[in-house]
Amino acid sequence: MRCSAVSLGSGTIINAIATGFGSAFGVDLKIKADVELLDNGKKIINGISIDNPTLKPSLVERCVKNVLDYFEVDYSAKISTSGDIPVKSGLSSSSAASNAAVLATIGALGEKVDSDLVLDLAIKSSFEEKLTVTGAYDDATASYFGGITVCNNMERKILKKDEFKEDIKVVVLMPEFQKNVDVKRMKLIKDYVDMAFEKCMAGDYYKALFLNGLLYSSALNFPSNISVDALEAGAITAGLSGTGPSYVALCYNENEKNVENALKKYGNTVITKPCINGARILY
């Protein structure tokens, strides 16, 4: 009983921590999970990251366990993950890994794939591993479905699905800044994040992303000038992704190199693009 599945990374439009409402978009970087189930009644689960064997596999092991518990089977399992989403890139590698792990385990069992169940078990696993504050339903759905999702994270509801109408690139900056998840400070900017979210609901995703980035970078003591540097180099919009320290900048193809050059003085960069084709079982 084997199965492989992939799920996307995602970038932030609105971080949901301040208000409970968030938005994210799928990017063309993926994590693949390969699951093999063993019907031996021992319930031993072993995981490994092929790209980074020193990375603890506790999240994907938890995902497999939760799926097996849900379907009330006592199989053992082996799970390996690989992909091109950099760890700590701000591109929701944990959402991608958990979605892919759950999907591959359900596939290996031969059970019918139900999107709500996949997302619920993936988010449950992230909560149990203390990897999320809000459940990251926006990140999880953008990773799973692709495109743009606008969500009520508290109620786990998708309020709106959309996609970018233009052919654009995503330049990701991964600086060596110390991560800061000060929830109290993020709650202080709630009213202003609400204003950015209104832009998002109206379909003005570029402005929403930029405003969100300014607000959260200020609250978390990350430099806001980086986003302006990206604009100066020709980006359409730019802002902090998630709780940082990474930033995302969206630009037209002809400005890709200028934007990358403006950002890479702050750290490593990755260039990708939005993706509307979400998670799927490969075989």
From Swiss-Prot:
GO terms for biological process: amino acid biosynthetic process; aromatic amino acid family biosynthetic process; chorismate biosynthetic process. It is found in: Cytoplasm. It comes from the Archaea. It holds the Pfam family GHMP_kinases_C. ATP binds at P86, V87, K88, S89, G90, L91, S92, S93, S94, S95, A96. SUPFAM superfamilies: GHMP Kinase, C-terminal domain (SSF55060), Ribosomal protein S5 domain 2-like (SSF54211). Its EC number is 2.7.1.71. Keywords: Amino-acid biosynthesis, Aromatic amino acid biosynthesis, ATP-binding, Cytoplasm, Kinase, Nucleotide-binding, Transferase. It catalyses: shikimate + ATP = 3-phosphoshikimate + ADP + H(+). GO terms for cellular component: cytoplasm. One of its GO terms (molecular function) is shikimate kinase activity. It is an enzyme of class 2 (transferase). Pathway: Metabolic intermediate biosynthesis; chorismate biosynthesis; chorismate from D-erythrose 4-phosphate and phosphoenolpyruvate: step 5/7. InterPro entries: GHMP_kinase_C_dom (IPR013750), GHMP_kinase_C_sf (IPR036554), GHMP_kinase_N_dom (IPR006204), Ribosomal_Su5_D2-typ_SF (IPR020568), Ribsml_uS5_D2-typ_fold_subgr (IPR014721), SK_arc (IPR010189). Its main location: cytoplasm. Belongs to the GHMP kinase family. Archaeal shikimate kinase subfamily. HAMAP family: Shik_kinase_arch. This is Shikimate kinase.
